[in-house]
Structures are given as C-alpha cells and as structure tokens.
Amino acid sequence: MQMWFSQYHTVNVKLDVRIQEQLFSGQSDYQKIDVFKSYEFGKMVALDGEIVFSDTDEFIYDEMVTHVPMAVHPNAKRILIIGGGDGGVAKELIKYPSVEHIDVVETDKMFVDVCRRFFPEVACGLEDERISMFYDDGLRFLRRKHDEYDLIINDSTDPLGHTEGLFTKEFYGSCYKALKDDGIMVYQHGSPFYDEDELECRKMHRKVYKSFPISRVYQAHIPTCPSGYWLFGFASKKYHPLYDLDAKRWDELGLKTWYYTTHLHRGAFMLPKYVEDLLEEEETK
C-alpha cells in the first residue's frame, strides 16, 4: 500500500509526495507538526499540513534569505531572526566570523525540539555560542527593541494563525525602529503565481514599500513551495541590494554554498514582467 502526503496549493491544485514512512506527528500549543521520510525529497516537515522545508531544498531558502543581505551590508554584527526555529538561517549566518550576536525568536518550542531531533544537520545552527534563543511572540519582542540590529530576517511561516501579526504594518514599523540607521530587513514574500497568493504578495509589498525608503523583491526556485516559484523581500534604510552589493568582499570570504552566488544575486532581482507589474501597481496606490 502506497502512502502519500497531499498539500493543496489552491482548491484546484495540489502537490502529492510519495512517503516512505511518517517519523513524527504531534500537536503543539500553536500548530500540528508532522515529519515524513519521502522518496523524492528525503525528510520533510509540515506545519498544519503545509511543507516548511525538506532535505533536498532547505538550502535554497536559507541561503537566499541570508547571503543576499550579508553581501550588501558592509558590517552586519547584530542580527535578529524571527521564527527560525529549525536553525537553517542561523546555520548560514554563523559562517560569518564578523557576526557577533544573533537573537532567535521562535514561538513554538515543540517545533524547535522536533527539528533538533529529526534535522540535526539543520538545527545545528542553534548551538553556536553567538546564538540567544527566545520563546516569545515576534511582534511583542520587537516592540521592546530600538536601534539595535544591523539585520532582521523574518523567517516566519505564512501570514495565518499565530504568525499573522508578523505581516502587519505595525510589524514592519517595529522592524524599522529596531534596526540601526543602515539596517536591512529580509522576509519571505510568498508566491505570486496563484490568484489568492498574488493578493497576499500585493498587500505585503504595499505595507513594506510604505515603511522603508528602499524596498525590492527577489526570487528563487524552491520545488516544495506552492508553484515552485518563491519571492523574498529586501527592505533597507540605506543600502540598495544591487547598487551596494559588494561581490568582491563576499567572494573573498570563501563561504561554501549550494545555491547562492554573487552572480545569482544580481539575477535574482530581475523579475518576470507580470511580477514587476503587480509590484509597481501597489507602489502607486
């Protein structure tokens, strides 16, 4: 008997993944957590029935939210990760010897424990001595911060349920206040391909565009994400993601990556026409 995991992307489209076995299933105070071993994607974790990452593609997301801003900011020392309980973003950040301190704010302790158990090669990022872990609501944590971080990475899940507050105008305003004068914020921007997802992308871009003087969007191909096409947001008080990219400095670090390069960095901001159009429409409202 074959076992399949199904995730609906719309009422008319779903992704089916053939499963070898279910490794874990549990209900935390915030969400249902499942871990599967699949034939195609290796181990993968799902929250409330939606794939968060898998063995085969987590490196794409984690590298793109980390190395894009780090190749632009000349000296990011203090960093905040909101979400990030799997440890993947922290794993990439601790590659930088210049990083002095990283705060990780995660709501769900069970999710962290599950990732440490089943994805130790990812969660190892949380074990570095520069990491401080907080189990708290991201927005509540941010309200207490002012002029503190060089970089904020919003690594939360979709804008629903207990993470909904991390996609509001207040949240982006709080990020702005928590950043230093030349700070950068990076966040997942979702997929613009399906109509319902496009609406969320539009709303998100409109809020960030009004909150930061520099707001750009970039892209990556992530197979387990809805439509396989994923956007990220880059918002900054000072630095432009292309004009201020210091490719020579980043390349000389010699960091090992599987997806990100400084050549790809430039190309990631070259968006399809339909995506450019929908973003520009929101900028004129």
UniProtKB/Swiss-Prot annotation:
Q: Where does S-methyl-5'-thioadenosine bind?
A: Q31, E106, D137, G138
Q: Which EC number(s) does UniProt give? A: 2.5.1.16
The question of whether Metal-binding is a record keyword is answered with: no
Keywords attached to this entry: Cytoplasm, Polyamine biosynthesis, Spermidine biosynthesis, Transferase
Task: Please give the Gene Ontology molecular function terms for this protein.
Answer: spermidine synthase activity
Sorted alphabetically, the Gene Ontology cellular component annotations on this record are:
cytosol
Which Pfam family is one of this chain's hits?
Answer: Spermine_synt_N
Instruction: State the PROSITE patterns in the record.
Output: PABS_1, PABS_2
Oligomer status and interactors: Homodimer or homotetramer.
- Assigned protein family: Belongs to the spermidine/spermine synthase family.
Task: Supply the name of the protein.
Answer: Polyamine aminopropyltransferase
Protein species of origin: Agathobacter rectalis (strain ATCC 33656 / DSM 3377 / JCM 17463 / KCTC 5835 / VPI 0990)
**Organism lineage:** Bacteria, Bacillati, Bacillota, Clostridia, Lachnospirales
Query: What gene does this protein come from?
Result: speE
